[in-house]
Amino acid sequence: MERRNTGWAKGFTKNTHPSLAKMAQTFKTKKIDNFKKWREESKLSGKIPASYPEFKKDKNLAFLIGMTLGDGNIYKFPRTENLRIALASKYPKLVAFTANVIKKVFSKTPTVRKIKNSRCFTVGIYQNNISSRLGIPTGERSRLNFNIPSWISENKIFLTNFLRGLFEAEGSLSVHLPTCTYNFSFANRNKSLLKIVEKSLKLLGYHPEIRSVAVRLRRKVEVENFKQLISFRVYKLRG
């Protein structure tokens, strides 16, 4: 006979369980932190970091910033923050590549989840001060007014990886050989991101076309060159 999971809290959270909901609300109202002692002891023992250093400025961080701006969100909670990047399940190698980059940036393994009844994976990680260290505000991305950091814009390798993150997230490449039509497009409704992509492509010597919700490369030579430059849809796990 199959054993059934009879855990007393199965299917509940502290806010929905009939016995815990009232207690949780009381703690919240009185601002009681029942984990404070444990957290302080964990910091002293090194189990929880007392502080979080700035991220190393390298190609992994540049890629992650671009990817987060394109397909990610940073959520703020009372005692932590959560970076979550949503990726199409038809690109499993991109999911693995992104998880590997996050692991290198954070020195911590992220959680990869398949979203039920969807064609989507999420790659996520919890840690304090994610937003301030990435330089990306928490909350809705569509209204975000982002300025590209100088350490990225002034370094070709970092700029290339930043653009790779953006194009892997929101880019599309189409080639119609009978008419010799080439289109490498970055589509987004955020005006500041479109301006950043336009400026970055020009810094690298390209001639982008600007549309209301997209920035495009249309010249055959530039499309082929840029695809190779950013290794678009080519994923080799970084050592």
Which role fits each region the language model picked out?
Residues 1-239:
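Internal intein/HINT superfamily modules and their associated LAGLIDADG
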